[in-house]
Amino acid sequence: MASLIYRQLLSNSYVTNISDEVNEIGTKKTTNVTVNPGPFAQTGYAPVDWGHGELPDSTLVQPTLDGPYQPTSLNLPVDYWMLIAPTREGKVAEGTNTTDRWFACVLVEPNVQNTQRQYVLDGQNVQLQVSNDSSTSWKFILFIKLTPDGTYTQYSTLSTPHKLCAWMKRDNRVYWYQGATPNASESYYLTINNDNSNVSSDAEFYLIPQSQTAMCTQYINNGLPPIQNTRNIVPVNITSRQIKDIRAQINEDIVISKTSLWKEMQYNRDIIIRFKFANSIIKSGGLGYKWSEISFKPMNYQYTYTRDGEEVTAHTTCSVNGVNDFNYNGGTLPTDFAISRFEVIKENSYVYVDYWDDSQAFRNMVYVRSLAANLNDVVCSGGSYSFALPVGNHPVMSGGAVTLTSAGVTLSTQYTDYVSLNSLRFRFRLAVSEPSFSISRTRMSGIYGLPAVNPNNNAEYYEIAGRFSLISLVLTNDDYQTPIANSVTVRQDLERQLGELREEFNSLSQEIAVSQLIDLATLPLDMFSMFSGIKSTVEAVKSMTTNVMKRFKTSSLANAISDLTSNMSEAASSVRLTSVRSVGTVTLPRARVSLQVSDDLRSMQDVSTQVSNVSRNLRLKEFTTQTDTLSFDDISAAVLKTKLDKSTQISQQTMPDIIAESSEKFIPKRSYRIVDEDTAFETGIDGTFYAYKVDTFNEIPFDMERFNKLVTDSPVLSAIIDFKTLKNLNDNYGITKKQAMELLHSNPKTLKEFINNNNPIIRNRIENLISQCRL
């Protein structure tokens, strides 16, 4: 049936999320571990998985073979092999340190007898004696001179068929490959000044880091890999590699989008969070041997620090949630040491730190999205506290430690003595650390966690470093600061939208086709089908459903169900959570309703008031005992679905309120019926009550005792066609006993037959119910 949407919302209405905990932290500091989820609950807590998102990686990944580069003159970087790959004979490269070393490398083709060849070296024409006896290998010859006017002499040779040679500057030396491939090896020959030695290459070359010397040796002896495996297909200028390192701006304001009035600003900030715990130690009256309470308290802390050369004034508020209560009792005598209650934070606890500073990022923190943070961990270690007894040695509680790890960030408001500040609430999960805490001269020892007795360990503060990022919608005029009080306009705008939407919803009632409504009321509408027809929200069904469930949890229907089942933990644990229809056989709700009915009938003198209160509970019983008959909730859900599809003003913001409000206000004048053989009992929320025979519709006296017993054992039915309508129908048209029973049980097929036959009495009744679906 269509009321499945309400059942699904109820089954998920007990899910708790982080925003609930954030809203309740100010009023509920201690969290009880006991959870009573109710018969419709699927889980106690929603899965929450916080992450820091993508982090920039500063790791430098160097290619093994960097190049090829175009022929050029450069100051070769230290600890890099310059692998030269000439394509023809002649001068390959030359270099100098401009003082006492000039060196040159030439390439000689195979089968060259001892001969004189002319080369241009250091700007001069030079005659050099070269030769190459090999018929297959090319020969690299290294020449060196020690003075500007000196003569080049042969220093080393490398024979290879691959036409590859390499040298490197390292430790004020020049390293070079010599010998013959495939057994060529590196060696050094020169002592030079690395800073002032330039190299001029007449051929394409590659750069290989010194850490990859083994790979360079492999290239020299075996040749380069195929060209498509190298980094640059087309040789580039070496200057393209010499890009200056630019330090990223850690704290920056980036304009994401901008219009004439508004702009989106992304604020990236480094942050230093300093906080401290506060505690309260209360001593009991009497002889002075007992303490009543040691507890955590919220603590405000203000400080300044330097961020990117700017002094920042920050304000933090530290509070805890989910504390664990411990106690120690040394005996029953008045002089026995005892602590009635002392708080300890452990793995199941959370620490909240609200942070605000006077930077630009917090000036207009009203409309915020894409909030993220990345923070370091911090260890909080407990100190010692001596319990001063009137006589005897003083017990000392000492030790205890926890590690705080970032678990998320949300928006919050800090309330100081003077102002309220829109701030960031950083949520930390805890892990216990060494050492454990103990109370000396007692048996209490080896307990892990951080007790409230001295959580700061006499330190001025705890400090956490990190960074956060957020995108805020601010006015284009930077001189205008959005007042914090203006944040209430968000709700005011929502109320205005809801008002307009209510008017539209109420006006749509007359556009609903009665026959189609019955068909829709018999469909099992789930949350997806309920929302999928709304424009621009198909992609957002998941997030919208979450918001609707959160709002529905506070509706009067959800609260009534919660009250009805507050003492049903055993029944709740036996309910199959995979199907809402499995709730149809609960016995305890019936007993509870019966007990409530009995109490009402005995305690109240006004029968009309009795019946009105009973009828309200009968709706809850009908809701927990789903049948195949049509109910008021089926009709209200069908009307809601129809109006949602027709509405032009529905939105994700207004949807939660509309869904919850429809469950409370649609069809306020309801009547419920219990059929006992040939007798029907009918009661209304407005206080009306009838008892009549089902075959003649003749009214009979209302038997309270009989009705009270039937409430426990008989199913409750929605009186879609109430007693007055049935009697009018029978008097004017005449109906068979079978039709009467089907109308009494709100059979949708029979109802549709009467509507399709244009029966004015039935049609007017359904139209009256539709008109009651108002907000």
UniProtKB/Swiss-Prot annotation:
Q: Where is this site: Cleavage?
A: 231-232, 241-242, 247-248
Region annotated Hydrophobic, chain positions? 389-409
InterPro entries from the UniProt entry: ConA-like_dom_sf (IPR013320), Rota_A_VP4 (IPR042546), Rota_VP4_MID (IPR035330), Rota_VP4_MID_sf (IPR038017), VP4_concanavalin-like (IPR000416), VP4_helical (IPR035329)
What the entry lists under Pfam families is as follows: Rota_VP4_MID, VP4_haemagglut, VP4_helical
Which residue spans adopt a coiled-coil conformation according to this UniProt entry? Answer: 484-511
Write out the ranges of the annotated region (Spike foot). Answer: 510-775
Which regions span the lipid bilayer? Answer: none
Q: What is this protein called?
A: Outer capsid protein VP4
From the broadest rank down, the organism's phylogenetic lineage runs:
Viruses, Riboviria, Orthornavirae, Duplornaviricota, Resentoviricetes
